[in-house]
């Protein structure tokens, strides 16, 4: 009886300690009424890093939480995951309105930054180790955050996204929008793209986020030219030029583009890959310096 009771208590204790995705309803300035979900592992690193993980169109925080193995890596490495969720525009992120494209002005971007600040305060997080990643619309928002809030994010990883400001002024940025100019590969000069980012935070002279850009070469929804344009943009902003192309990295069928010494900007293009998530958690976390 004693053994059985002890085992029952142990199981109950383990159940109570098991981390899970939790909604936070009050986290600060939230002009577009987006939702915040957070995953805090049971064993946190001292002054833990924070990753913002952004879902695609039609997705949700819960869907993206289950869509990668990042929660398992968080358990093993003690970092916090924030999963923003938008109920607007077919669950697509606002990447087109001036507010979200301008530092401190509003939009989805400001709500997400509020989530970051809340998390850093509540869990004594490391403000120098805040990162963003996302697929499709989430990748697009990752670029917006890196452009509008370079003082918040140390690095980003964009999967099947578009350049910062690519959809500026559009009525919406959903797959159902009649205006698909951006997603079909809108082209500008590197200087023009770079100016979009610099103008998002006028007068800012601090460091800029390190960026990785991933895209499938068979993507017809968001054309691979979009990734080329994003690389032009960040190459201009970060002041690095293409120095090397390596086949078979991170796996057969992929080509890696290295800019400068590779520490600030990298691009990856996959043969036979359409519009699909290609998140390699180990590669991502190595880029963020978390493993």
From Swiss-Prot:
Protein name stated in the entry: Feruloyl esterase B
EC number: 3.1.1.73
Reactions this protein catalyses: feruloyl-polysaccharide + H2O = ferulate + polysaccharide
CC annotations in GO: extracellular region
Function comment: Feruloyl esterase which acts in synergy with xylanases in degradation of plant cell walls. Hydrolyzes the ester linkage of hydroxycinnamic acids (ferulic acid (FA) and p-coumaric acid) and diferulates present in plant cell walls. Efficiently releases ferulic acid (FA) from destarched wheat bran when incubated with an M3 xylanase.
Any one Gene Ontology BP term: xylan catabolic process
Domain of life: Eukaryota
Gene label: Fae1a
Family per similarity comment: Belongs to the carbohydrate esterase 1 (CE1) family. Feruloyl esterase type B subfamily.
pH profile of the protein: Optimum pH is 7.0.
Range of residues in the leader sequence: 1-18
Top EC class of this enzyme: hydrolase
Chief localization: secreted
Keyword hit for Hydrolase: yes
A Pfam family it matches: Esterase_PHB
């Amino acid at each position: 009886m004693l053994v059985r009771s002890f085992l029952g208590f142990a199981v109950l204790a383990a159940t109570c300690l098991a981390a899970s995705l939790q909604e936070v309803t009050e986290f600060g300035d939230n002009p577009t009424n987006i939702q915040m979900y957070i995953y805090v592992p049971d064993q946190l690193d001292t002054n833990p890093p924070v990753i913002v993980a952004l879902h695609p169109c039609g997705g949700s925080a819960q869907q993206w939480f289950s869509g990668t193995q990042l929660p398992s890596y968080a358990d093993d490495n003690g970092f916090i995951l924030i999963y923003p969720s938008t109920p607007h525009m077919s669950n697509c992120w606002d990447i087109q309105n001036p507010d979200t494209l301008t530092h401190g002005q509003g939009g989805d971007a400001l709500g997400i930054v509020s989530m970051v600040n809340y998390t850093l305060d509540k869990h004594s997080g490391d403000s120098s180790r805040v990162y963003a990643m996302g697929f499709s619309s989430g990748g697009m928002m990752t670029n917006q955050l890196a452009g509008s809030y370079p003082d918040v994010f140390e690095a980003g990883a964009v999967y099947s996204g578009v350049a910062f400001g690519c959809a500026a002024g559009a009525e919406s940025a959903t797959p159902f929008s009649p205006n698909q100019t951006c997603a079909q590969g809108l082209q500008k000069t590197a200087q023009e793209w770079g100016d979009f980012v610099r103008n998002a935070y006028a007068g800012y002279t601090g460091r800029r986020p390190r960026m990785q850009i991933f895209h499938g070469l068979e993507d017809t929804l968001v054309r691979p030219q979009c990734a080329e344009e994003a690389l032009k943009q960040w190459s201009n902003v970060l002041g690095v030029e293409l120095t090397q192309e390596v086949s078979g990295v991170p796996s057969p069928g992929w080509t890696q583009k290295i800019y400068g010494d590779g520490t600030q900007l990298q691009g990856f293009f996959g043969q036979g890959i359409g519009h699909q998530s290609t998140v390699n958690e180990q590669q991502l976390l190595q880029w963020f310096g978390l493993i």
